[in-house]
Amino acid sequence: MKSAKLGFLLRFFIFCSLNTLLLGGVNKIAEKICGDLKDPCKLDMNFGSCYEVHFRYFYNRTSKRCETFVFSGCNGNLNNFKLKIEREVACVAKYKPPR
């Protein structure tokens, strides 16, 4: 994923995550805009659309496990982790903040 696009997605993810804490009453609007971006682990794995080869981790909702896949280098989504520990911090319940 190109750094500018990844930066935008990360900022959007942070906005969606913090919106609940900061704006309280606007939760319904944020939910419509952000949807599952609050939790990258709810997103399906996406290979991307380029032709590079990057081995990455993603959370498989069906098997409830961390699995590897080959990322193409651009596009894709936030369910795409370079390190297994990054995926665990994002997707394992004991590391997630309480809701």
UniProtKB/Swiss-Prot annotation:
Residues 1-24 form the signal peptide. GO terms for molecular function: serine-type endopeptidase inhibitor activity. The keyword Signal applies. GO terms for cellular component: extracellular region. Keywords: Disulfide bond, Protease inhibitor, Secreted, Serine protease inhibitor, Signal. Disulfide bonds join C41-C91, C50-C74. Residues 41-91 form the BPTI/Kunitz inhibitor domain. SMART domains: KU. SUPFAM superfamilies: BPTI-like. It is found in: Secreted. The keyword Ubl conjugation does not apply. InterPro entries: Kunitz_BPTI, Kunitz_BPTI_sf, SPINT4. This is Kunitz-type protease inhibitor 4. It comes from Homo sapiens (Human). The gene is SPINT4.
